[in-house]
Amino acid sequence: MILGCALVSHPGSAATTLTVGKASATSDALVPVNVGYELGIFEKHGLDLKIVDFTGGSKMDQAMAAGSLDISAGDGTEMAFIAKGLPMRAVCMIAGPPSFLGIGVPGDSPITSAEQLKGKKIGISSPGSFTEWLARELARNKGWGPDGVTPVAIGNGVVSVTAAFRQHLVDADVGGVATFLNMEEQKIGRLLVPVSSYEGSIASGTFSASNHLIQTNPDAIRTFLAAWLETIGYVRTHKAETVKMESRIDQLPEEVVSKDYDVTIGMFTSDCKFDPAALATLKRGFVELKFVDTPPDMSKLYTEAFLPH
């Protein structure tokens, strides 16, 4: 049983069923899974996807550990938990620079620059998540040290972030640029800075396959990645159609999604290959942020064996 999530399944049947977990329902790096699903691209490749949306990477990791997922879609920090024994391996670098993420503040906040966040409470999706890492990376890059800000787990749903802003449970939040752009329209919050203003090369999105799937059906992984890359090709060349679909999926106005599309479309990789610079950044971060005790051998955490030729 998978708890703390939302499930979407295609009504039809296909040759191979894959349960795909997403760490966030509306993350720009992950929503193309839903786009490809709705377009029938995965089905065309002989796959019947069951998409499970979680409210953070930790809950998704629990489902993977329990054997409930075949594929997980999250961020680069998920690889740290592979080093700690999570039974999966990263198989695709979805996105590089985290252009889809930013730091937002409540609409009535007096904060006008990132420098004013020193010592402040910053909302994150869950402990050990990519958003926690980015909050702590802000402190490190500003010279405040890894404890220069206080991460507060509030989830990554719009409702929970909105409530945290209105009740001033946090001074800021690491979340989707689109979310903050929409909040600005409603005077709930506003975008302070994009994460890319202080964080460069990093694997901001990855697919991982369960060890069970790797051992029992490696061809399904190859097929999934081929369908994914076909989906990204469509997203790149069909802005209007993509914006309309993602607007409905994210429940955001098309004008907001259109602006967000322009900011984020360049982050997707065209071949799923892992960037050495991004891996080096992750390796450093895993230790600095105490996800692991010693630097892991990154080559054991991912494989490019399933990439389409």
Feature-to-residue mapping (PLM):
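N-terminal signal peptide c-region/cleavage motif recognized by signal peptidases
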Residues: S9-P11
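Short, glycine-/small- and polar/acidic-enriched structural segments
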Residues: T16-G157, A164, D171-V177, L191-V195, ...
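Solvent-exposed, polar/charged alpha-helical surfaces in well-ordered, non-transmembrane soluble domains
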Residues: L39-G40, Q62, A66, R89, ...
